[in-house]
Amino acid sequence: MSLNMFWFLPTHGDGHYLGTEEGSRPVDHGYLQQIAQAADRLGYTGVLIPTGRSCEDAWLVAASMIPVTQRLKFLVALRPSVTSPTVAARQAATLDRLSNGRALFNLVTGSDPQELAGDGVFLDHSERYEASAEFTQVWRRLLLGETVNFNGKHIHVRGAKLLFPPIQQPYPPLYFGGSSDVAQELAAEQVDLYLTWGEPPELVKEKIEQVRAKAAAHGRKIRFGIRLHVIVRETNDEAWQAAERLISHLDDETIAKAQAAFARTDSVGQQRMAALHNGKRDNLEISPNLWAGVGLVRGGAGTALVGDGPTVAARINEYAALGIDSFVLSGYPHLEEAYRVGELLFPHLDVAIPEIPQPQPLNPQGEAVANDFIPRNVAQS
């Protein structure tokens, strides 16, 4: 099975070390463009662009990278409760059209009550998933070309429609990650690819089996992906030394503050990440070559595969054997590590190299009539 390898655009900052200004660098448009172009040339399938108040806007960043890349896909967040599904469907179709079919979408429900309140969202965990399920139903139906009337608990639309369809049919693939039962049910019923954070293989296997069974109950099959950091070097010793350097400027106070912030979230996945290290610096190798040091101060994906190319490739293939076909990777700093992964890891894997999409045929189109429909040719009387 060929593997889809993704990279990451660090719109919330980048550098050589975690938890310090030491070794940091400016993350401006030019730098993000360098990373995107490196990923494009090295054969990555796409890039994940993060979302939230600590990040630049993912949609604008993705749109700005379209002209400077050829085949790279952009995995961009959909935010139920923050954005209406009709607006999100128009945005998604437009991004897909402008990129010639290079748009992918990642459903993000949110987990930090403090940040959500700042965005005007005051739903609890279960209510957010109710709203996300309704959002996704409307979003998918619009992209399928339906005129949608929907009267849900959280979302109400009447006569909603999309005039400009996406390039990818029936719609651009929808990714989603969540560890709670209600999250897995949403994934099983509505999304195309279920993402998990980088837990030890036995825990990942358990989640995959749960989601696969839930999807089968809906008569569906679903793909799987995993989000991991990677520290790959020419030797295993060099890789572990690089891992230790990454957290060499962290002090206990910074770790404690970060863990306190993570504790206020209601994300089951974040709780599972925190349990891998319990906020302590010792025993961070939680599974062979799987290191939890990143999660001491970074929310979300908090583990890294560490080793030389053949070793990391062997660990990736262990996850692939569980049914995972997509790997969303990152490393610090992201420009240099994109090259290291491409040069030291890719030769030891069966990597799916994306093709440059072919230009779409030009279809003449008149101006929309009455903000309601696109004029079509009619017989002359």
Curated annotation (Swiss-Prot):
Family annotation (Pfam families): Bac_luciferase
Gene Ontology biological-process entries: alkanesulfonate catabolic process
Enzyme Commission identifier(s): 1.14.14.5
Keyword Zinc-finger part of the UniProt annotation: no
Broad enzyme group: oxidoreductase
Catalytic activity: an alkanesulfonate + FMNH2 + O2 = an aldehyde + FMN + sulfite + H2O + 2 H(+)
UniProt-recorded Gene Ontology molecular function terms: alkanesulfonate monooxygenase activity
Keywords for the protein's UniProt record, in alphabetical order: Flavoprotein, FMN, Monooxygenase, Oxidoreductase
Complexes and interactors: Homotetramer.
Additional free-text comment from the UniProt record: FMNH(2) which is absolutely required for this enzymatic reaction, is provided by SsuE.
UniProt similarity note: Belongs to the SsuD family.
HAMAP family, alphabetized: Alkanesulf_monooxygen
Function: Catalyzes the desulfonation of aliphatic sulfonates.
Protein name from the UniProt record: Alkanesulfonate monooxygenase
Annotated organism of origin: Escherichia coli O6:K15:H31 (strain 536 / UPEC)
Gene that encodes it: ssuD
